[in-house]
């Protein structure tokens, strides 16, 4: 296991070397990870929106965004600026308090979930021992905001969209949690860092995708449903509900929903990479690479290179999954609401439960391979 680089310790030592007391150095560090997280999540949304528009254009034999910056890279920024500057309209008969709180309750838990995401051994905001439990708890808050937004709009399409969104989120949260618990069982920990470390040592052969072939499929399907991506975009089906729970929203409040959907997609892809694709781990073990080049793995400059490339590996795996999600938008049709709920309750839930029981049995029978 690569011990990695302690960014917090390095930052505090560097600041102390400038004559600043230790307490002040720690106080300077505290807001820094949060600001980096907010900035990184926002930039990732801009990248994903640009990718979606370009890939969608390619699927339809169009060019897509082209003139707003090189290759249209500034088009998402222009979209965001337009939404921020638009008038914030509240329907006359809407419940103004719930109408305002709804988007915030949807977006804030998604951003807080980034707290547990590791990009390296010490490259995360906080390594809480109950990281997976915290993520599941935060994700369970989102349906409340969706239902509040649909109800508060005083619009039949918004209400139906909110009810659909809440039902869909609750239906797929259980299979999602059970598939993740199988990984937690093998790792003997709820920490995302420990889950990645459990996959280290054997390169690509040690990744959980091989030990959880059913679990990773369940996780991906449930994650797409939680993100309301096609074929599971029932809450905002344009042909049926105009825009679902977002129908009456405009300006900054609509921008929060727009931002939250893409932040959630990026979060799901990053979690998939951490849980099943080894996170920052290379397809070839780091010990093998250091042996081939004849440099000890503990060498500081080599650790710095590994940490930098490790961030790239995590993002590469995540963006590959995002590419698949965008591609699915143009290759599969939308399911009906009854098919959606049947898939969640009658198929994914029992299969994920059986997968968890089988994982427990394999853990007892083959403790070395399944983390006994």
Curated annotation (Swiss-Prot):
It is an enzyme of class 7 (translocase). It comes from Leptolyngbya boryana. Its EC number is 7.1.1.-. NCBIfam families: PRK06076.1-2, PRK06076.1-5. NDH-1 shuttles electrons from an unknown electron donor, via FMN and iron-sulfur (Fe-S) centers, to quinones in the respiratory and/or the photosynthetic chain. The immediate electron acceptor for the enzyme in this species is believed to be plastoquinone. Couples the redox reaction to proton translocation, and thus conserves the redox energy in a proton gradient. Belongs to the complex I subunit 1 family. One of its GO terms (molecular function) is quinone binding. Its main location: membrane. Keywords: Membrane, NAD, NADP, Plastoquinone, Quinone, Thylakoid, Translocase, Transmembrane, Transmembrane helix. Pfam families: NADHdh. It is found in: Cellular thylakoid membrane. NDH-1 is composed of at least 11 different subunits. This is NAD(P)H-quinone oxidoreductase subunit 1. It catalyses: a plastoquinone + NADH + (n+1) H(+)(in) = a plastoquinol + NAD(+) + n H(+)(out); a plastoquinone + NADPH + (n+1) H(+)(in) = a plastoquinol + NADP(+) + n H(+)(out). The lineage of its organism: Bacteria, Bacillati, Cyanobacteriota, Cyanophyceae, Leptolyngbyales. InterPro entries: NADH_UbQ_OxRdtase_su1/FPO (IPR001694), NADH_UbQ_OxRdtase_su1_CS (IPR018086). It is a multi-pass membrane protein. HAMAP family: NDH1_NuoH (MF_01350). GO terms for biological process: aerobic respiration; photosynthesis, light reaction. One of its GO terms (cellular component) is plasma membrane-derived thylakoid membrane. PROSITE patterns: COMPLEX1_ND1_1 (PS00667), COMPLEX1_ND1_2 (PS00668). The chain crosses the membrane at residues 31-51, 65-85, 97-117, 128-148, 176-196, 254-276, 304-324, 347-367.
């Amino acid at each position: 296991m690569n011990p990695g680089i302690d960014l917090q310790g390095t930052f505090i030592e560097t600041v102390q070397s400038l004559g600043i007391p230790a307490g002040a150095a720690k106080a300077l560090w505290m807001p820094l990870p949060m600001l980096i997280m907010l900035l990184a999540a926002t930039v990732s949304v801009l990248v994903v929106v640009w990718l979606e528009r370009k890939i969608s254009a390619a699927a339809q034999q169009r060019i897509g965004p082209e003139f707003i910056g090189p290759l249209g890279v500034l088009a998402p920024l222009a979209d965001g600026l337009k939404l921020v500057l638009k008038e914030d309209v509240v329907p006359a008969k809407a419940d103004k308090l719930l109408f305002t709180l709804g988007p915030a309750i949807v977006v804030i838990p998604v951003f807080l979930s980034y707290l547990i995401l590791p990009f390296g051994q010490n490259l995360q905001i906080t390594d809480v021992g109950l990281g997976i439990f915290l993520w599941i708890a935060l994700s369970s808050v989102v349906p409340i905001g969706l239902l509040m937004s649909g109800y508060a709009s005083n619009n039949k399409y918004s209400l139906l969209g909110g009810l659909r969104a809440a039902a869909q989120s609750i239906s797929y949260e259980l299979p999602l949690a059970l598939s993740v618990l199988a990984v937690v069982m093998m790792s003997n920990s709820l920490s995302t860092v420990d889950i990645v470390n459990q996959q280290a040592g054997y390169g690509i052969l040690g990744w959980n995708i091989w030990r959880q072939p059913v679990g990773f499929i369940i996780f991906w399907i449930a994650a797409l449903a939680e993100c309301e991506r096609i074929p599971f975009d029932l809450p905002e089906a344009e042909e049926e509900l105009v825009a679902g729970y977002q129908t009456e929203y405009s300006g900054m409040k609509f921008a929060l929903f727009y931002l939250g959907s893409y932040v959630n997609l990026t979060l799901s892809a990053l979690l998939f990479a951490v849980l099943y694709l080894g996170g920052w781990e290379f397809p070839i073990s780091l010990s093998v690479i250091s042996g081939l080049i004849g440099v000890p793995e503990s060498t500081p400059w080599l650790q710095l290179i590994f940490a930098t490339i490790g961030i790239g590996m995590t993002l590469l795996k995540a963006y590959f999954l995002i590419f698949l999600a965008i591609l699915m938008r143009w290759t599969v049709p939308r399911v009906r609401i009854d098919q959606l709920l049947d898939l969640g309750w009658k198929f994914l839930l029992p299969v994920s439960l059986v997968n968890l029981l089988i994982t427990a049995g394999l853990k007892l029978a083959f403790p070395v391979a399944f983390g006994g």
